[in-house]
């Protein structure tokens, strides 16, 4: 069974692979594609100059076959496909060399994971109750805001009580002095 691949100089070469070597290559490429989901790893690659090498950019283009559903179903971190797509842009590759850019991308990935994906999972698990779930979350948000407002009011009242206590203590002391 033959397979086209890119060598380090960017040229297509026809190579004969055994079943075992195909399996190994599949696993290695799968792991590498999933590693692209980590913005810190992208920062590492960019700082080491990999994104400036033509053979590596060609390899990233070659890896786009992972977007095919038969391959994508093997991925544990599907956001890696978005990163792989973004890496096709020279501007994105250049910006990943800077720590703050990588940190920004990492923050966005974390926010996506924390909020959108959890809510989506709950909605997918309970499609009939999805509307009720959204309403109950809105009610919970309102209750949370009310609780915060009450806490703020109590906080505002406490300094007044402390001030009144100090004033009464001061007035008691001043009466004793007279």
UniProtKB/Swiss-Prot annotation:
One GO molecular-function annotation for this sequence?
transcription coregulator activity
Alphabetical keyword list: Activator, Nucleus, Transcription, Transcription regulation
- Region described as Disordered: 129-178
Q: Which Gene3D superfamilies match?
A: Mediator of RNA polymerase II, submodule Med31 (Soh1)
Q: Which residues fall in a compositionally biased region of kind Polar residues? A: 166-178
Renumbered to this chain, the Acidic residues biased-composition regions fall at: 129-140
Membrane-spanning parts: none
One GO cellular component term:
mediator complex
One GO term of the biological process aspect: regulation of transcription by RNA polymerase II
- Cell compartments where the protein resides: Nucleus
Q: Where is the composition biased (Basic and acidic residues)?
A: 155-165
Function of the molecule: Component of the Mediator complex, a coactivator involved in the regulated transcription of nearly all RNA polymerase II-dependent genes. Mediator functions as a bridge to convey information from gene-specific regulatory proteins to the basal RNA polymerase II transcription machinery. Mediator is recruited to promoters by direct interactions with regulatory proteins and serves as a scaffold for the assembly of a functional preinitiation complex with RNA polymerase II and the general transcription factors.
Return the PANTHER family for the record. MEDIATOR OF RNA POLYMERASE II TRANSCRIPTION SUBUNIT 31 (PTHR13186)
| Family that this chain belongs to | Belongs to the Mediator complex subunit 31 family.
Assembly description = Component of the Mediator complex.
Q: What is this protein called?
A: Mediator of RNA polymerase II transcription subunit 31
Organism this protein belongs to: Caenorhabditis elegans
Source species taxonomy: Eukaryota, Metazoa, Ecdysozoa, Nematoda, Chromadorea
């Amino acid at each position: 069974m033959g397979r086209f691949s890119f060598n380090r100089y960017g040229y297509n070469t026809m190579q004969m692979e055994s079943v075992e070597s195909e399996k190994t290559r599949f696993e290695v490429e799968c792991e590498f594609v999933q590693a692209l989901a980590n913005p810190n790893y992208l920062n590492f690659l960019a700082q080491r100059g990999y994104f400036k090498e033509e053979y590596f950019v060609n390899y990233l283009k070659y890896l786009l076959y992972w977007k095919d559903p038969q391959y994508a179903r093997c991925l544990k971190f599907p956001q890696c496909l978005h990163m792989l797509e973004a890496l096709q842009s020279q501007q994105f590759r250049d910006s990943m060399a800077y720590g703050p850019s990588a940190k920004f991308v990492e923050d966005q990935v974390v926010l996506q994971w924390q909020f959108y994906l959890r809510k989506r999972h709950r909605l997918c698990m309970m499609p009939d109750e999805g509307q009720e779930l959204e309403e109950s979350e809105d009610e919970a948000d309102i209750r949370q805001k009310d609780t915060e407002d009450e806490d703020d009011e109590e906080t505002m009242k406490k300094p007044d009580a402390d001030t009144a206590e100090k004033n009464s203590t001061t007035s008691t002391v001043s009466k004793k002095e007279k």
